[in-house]
């Protein structure tokens, strides 16, 4: 479900959904990075789909969690309350640092117990070790993905060092696979886990 839609989140929660991602490829910050005018940039796989949609005349509006005053939008606050009420997992998606610095403390304040800081070593969602530790202080877990390393967006040693410094108990690993040009998710997870060992 796209957008910041509390009703959709409520209905999803009632249907048993356990995880809510905040905006990813349609986030204003992510779109600005992917489409910054650099013709030589190696874009994310999904960016080619956005370009195809635009060529077909399909609108691709962007989403920001903050209002014009730099505060979290009311819809975001409503979504946080729903996540807390149903004990769902909040994943930060590809939101900007400014959005995350507001979202995570507010989520914790409103009773969200399960928070994932998505792709902490990915270029657009990269967080320093200090930032990661700050998020952990709110109960968050920091996610590291196979594809970030495997596609050359981060050095493996950087990821491993982040995990050591933040603490393995405060980190989770995933693959971020599903792209048909790469391996299957289970294969990626196995390779990533083996390399981390």
Range-by-range predicted roles:
Residues 6-16, 36-116, 124-140, 154-173, ...:
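Histidine/acidic residue-rich metal-binding segments in metalloenzymes
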Residues 139-151:
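His/Asp/Glu-enriched short active-site or ligand-binding loop at hydrolase and phosphoryl-transfer sites
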Residues 2-33:
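A generic, well-ordered mixed alpha/beta core segment in the N-terminal half of proteins
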Residues 1, 25-26, 95, 120-122, ...:
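Active-site metal-binding loops of divalent metal-dependent hydrolases
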